[in-house]
């Protein structure tokens, strides 16, 4: 099969979740004999035309001077144009929809017959509170257009799958994100942050309102753990919401904003040795950092929503508000005694059985073959 990954910011990954996904899946598919191309913006530091057998197609992107939002529309448009007009792909995998819809309409993707265009719908983007009212309306329109113009949809979370079925009557294929079990934790990484094993809490997220950082912080501050074990907040603080959080909570003795941590071993070690891990993401789908926390054997306390429950199932305790966070922390020793081993063991098994990258390569290969069978038997 000839397969393309479009609307990713290149591989090897130096950007985010879709890029890590594209790297693992594309390399895995190449090892199985498929011809895979990943589109990459011109500003990506990796300039070779091949990576571990994957063809890299470099496309000019003005994002560095035009800005990420506007520039990404241009980059995605030119990438899809190349994939449709100059190549002969069997499958074009579209990673998200928020900057590709004008290209979908321009190229009349729904009537394309040469290639099968399948779109990963990501989360409920129009619910992201970082967008103002008008942007959310535009993104909601984009969602409808993605459903209309894509040949097939992919959902990385069963909550997302159910949403599209109920709202649009459209089926989507559940194909999750992945993670690998970690086994090289290094307690020495704690020293850099003045931490001790199981004597701190951790939250890892983009500092955006929909990730409910305020809920976790307020719950912590009103608990008996405030000042006893610090709450470590990992994430860039240069977002508007991040700046608000630092201004409001930065002087609290128990709350520490440490910025982003991009050394994977360091981050997973700090996750692993925590007393508990807060996961507040609430707009879906399957968040990569949640899978990484599961793979790192974290004791996870999660915001109560359908997306987190779809992944964690019975291997977490859930909080709908700050008061519940306070209640949990006030009883943390009993909670850990009752649940920690069962929850962490259960999450590790879930990663092995459902979210390992090798398993996901199997699933994607099988699904892409099925798509071609549908095409040739129509």
Please state what every model-predicted region is.
Residues 4, 194-222, 232:
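Conserved donor-binding/catalytic core segment of Leloir-type glycosyltransferases
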Residues 269-285, 298:
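Acidic donor-binding loop of glycosyltransferase active sites
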Residues 295, 299-302:
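Short hydrophobic beta-strand element within catalytic cores of glycosyltransferases
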Residues 71-84, 89-122, 285:
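An aromatic- and histidine-rich active-site surface loop
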């Amino acid at each position: 099969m000839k397969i393309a990954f479009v609307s990713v910011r290149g591989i090897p990954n130096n950007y985010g979740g879709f890029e890590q996904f594209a790297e693992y899946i594309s390399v895995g598919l190449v090892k199985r004999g498929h011809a895979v191309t990943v589109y990459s913006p011109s500003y990506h530091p990796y300039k070779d035309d091949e990576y571990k057998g994957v063809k890299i197609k470099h496309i000019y992107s003005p994002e560095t001077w035009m800005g990420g939002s506007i520039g990404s529309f241009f980059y995605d448009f030119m990438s899809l144009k190349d994939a449709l007009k100059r190549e002969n792909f069997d499958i074009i995998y579209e990673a998200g929809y928020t900057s590709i819809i004008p290209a979908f309409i321009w190229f009349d993707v729904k009537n394309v017959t040469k290639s099968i265009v399948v779109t990963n719908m990501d989360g409920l983007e129009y619910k992201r509170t970082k967008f103002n009212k008008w942007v959310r309306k535009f993104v909601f329109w984009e969602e409808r257009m993605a459903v209309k113009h894509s040949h097939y949809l992919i959902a990385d979370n069963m909550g997302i799958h159910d949403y599209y079925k109920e709202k649009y009557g459209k089926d989507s294929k559940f194909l999750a994100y992945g993670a690998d079990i970690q086994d090289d934790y290094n307690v020495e990484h704690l020293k850099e942050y003045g931490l001790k094993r199981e004597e701190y809490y951790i939250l890892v997220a983009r500092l955006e309102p929909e990730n409910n950082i305020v809920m976790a912080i307020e719950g912590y501050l009103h608990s008996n753990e405030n000042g006893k074990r610090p709450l470590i907040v990992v994430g860039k603080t240069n977002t508007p919401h991040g700046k608000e959080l630092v201004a409001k909570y930065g002087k609290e003795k128990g709350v520490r904003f440490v910025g982003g941590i991009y050394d994977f071993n360091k981050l997973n070690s700090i996750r692993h040795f925590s007393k508990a891990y807060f996961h507040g993401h609430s707009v879906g789908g399957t968040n990569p950092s949640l899978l990484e926390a599961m793979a790192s054997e974290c004791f996870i306390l999660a915001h109560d929503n359908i997306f987190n429950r779809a992944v964690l199932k019975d291997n977490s305790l859930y909080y709908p508000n700050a008061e519940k966070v306070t209640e949990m922390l006030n009883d943390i020793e009993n909670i850990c005694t009752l649940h920690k081993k069962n929850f962490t063991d259960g999450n590790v098994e879930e990663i092995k059985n459902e979210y390992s990258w090798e398993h996901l390569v199997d699933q994607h290969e099988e699904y892409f073959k099925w798509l071609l069978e549908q095409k040739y038997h129509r």
